[in-house]
Amino acid sequence: AKFVTSASNGLNTSYEPGKTFDVYRSFLTANPDVQFIENVDIGAEHADRAIESLGMTGKVFTIGWNSSKGQLDAIEKGIQVAQLDQRWPDQAAFGAPACAQFLKNGVILPNTQTLKAVTKDGVAEARKELDATMQQK
């Protein structure tokens, strides 16, 4: 595999959907041989949108972190191969006891969180979990 970016020259995206989309469109236009993008947080669904808008579906694929409807849609379309769900409710629930243990006893608790890879066959279940988390029906 040939990596176009590295830790020292990574792509600078943001939490703003429009800017992230534009960064990915520019990146893919300048690097038409890219085949795979890994992204975190909101970025993957906007990389997916950029791939689709440039007509690169089936040529460029993604994987992304955290659950979103846009990523689940892209998995169903075959653009995104998986979503790595960090399980937000578990993340949130861990913070209070971890802080309490550290502040009271100086103990750093090990991370008990498990990562859940969501592929095409798990999209329906992931949508239900996301809707429950976001209280969207």
Residue ranges of predicted features:
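A residue-level marker of the well-folded mature domains of exported/periplasmic proteins
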Residues: 1-137
